[in-house]
Amino acid sequence: MNPLLDAHNLTHHFETLLYENLSLSVNEGESIAILGVSGSGKSTILNNLSTLLPPKKGRVSLLGINDIYALSAKEQLSLRRLQLGIVFQAHYLFRGFSGIENLKVASILSGESIDKEILESFDIAKVVHQPIGQLSGGQQQRLSIARVLTKKPKIIFADEPTGNLDKQTATRVMEIMFEYIRTHKGALVLATHDQDIAQSCDRIYHLYDRALHRVK
């Protein structure tokens, strides 16, 4: 079986070296958690893997594409819109829109319809018509994940997706995401500091000493 994602010898640095010669593959139906302290490079890895930030060295293969950074900017944008789901820590919802309008943007760009069952599952169906500014941090976080699932992506990259959620809600949200990748034969790559959330994934890696160390 060919992996959905295959990263080879990634190296990245800003002022200092974050990691070097990092390799990772993710298969259909798999969930991967990356643990690490703040500033260790977890978010940067997700950005490298999802076309948002080219690594300084190395190659990323996604969904049969040998090197995603050999694509044009337009082709990378199309890949993100149609095949990838990215859950940002800061949500990046359109502030001037209501919740449902944010979902409609994802629906239009991907050609997929809004799934009302997802809204019910995330307990946001009753508030989805309110302006973003009137939603709590937890509601915004759930809405941002619902927006990603609306696109029906093949691979989901999630950066601290449960950071604003209580433990019970976080568990429920992760169950929905796991069910999604099983049903749609997709994959999930998760960056988190939450040990409990990480333990629910198929594999766990700890980022330290400039490398990924498998712990599960």
Name these PLM-found stretches:
Residues 50:
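Helix-to-loop junction immediately C-terminal to a conserved catalytic motif
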Residues 58-67:
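Conserved ABC transporter NBD signature motif
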Residues 67, 112-127:
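Conserved ABC ATPase "signature" region
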Residues 67-85:
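ABC ATPase NBD coupling module
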Residues 131-135, 139-141:
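Conserved ABC ATPase signature
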Residues 152:
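Conserved catalytic motifs of ABC-family nucleotide-binding domains
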Residues 156-159:
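Catalytic Walker B motif of ABC-type/P-loop ATPase nucleotide-binding domains
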